[in-house]
Structures are given as structure tokens and as C-alpha cells.
């Protein structure tokens, strides 16, 4: 579950980073 899809996609990681 991606908290912030922008950070999730932007970071290109598997884990959704809230703090980027």
C-alpha cells in the first residue's frame, strides 16, 4: 500500500517511502 504514490514512484523503490 503506497502512502504517497508520488514518492513511491519517484523513488522507484518497492517500499513506499513517506519521507521520500
UniProtKB/Swiss-Prot annotation:
Gene Ontology molecular functions: metalloendopeptidase activity
Domain of life: Eukaryota
GO biological process assignments: collagen catabolic process; proteolysis
Keyword check for Acyltransferase: no
InterPro entries, alphabetized: Peptidase_M12A
Catalytic activity: Cleavage of the triple helix of collagen at about three-quarters of the length of the molecule from the N-terminus, at 775-Gly-|-Ile-776 in the alpha1(I) chain. Cleaves synthetic substrates and alpha-macroglobulins at bonds where P1' is a hydrophobic residue
Entry annotated with the keyword Zinc: yes
Domain Peptidase M12A intervals: 1-20
Cofactor comment text: Binds 1 zinc ion per subunit.
Keywords: Collagen degradation, Hydrolase, Metalloprotease, Protease, Zinc
EC number: 3.4.24.7
Function, as annotated: This enzyme is a metal protease capable of degrading the native triple helix of collagen.
Designated name of the protein: Collagenolytic protease 23 kDa
Organism: Chionoecetes opilio
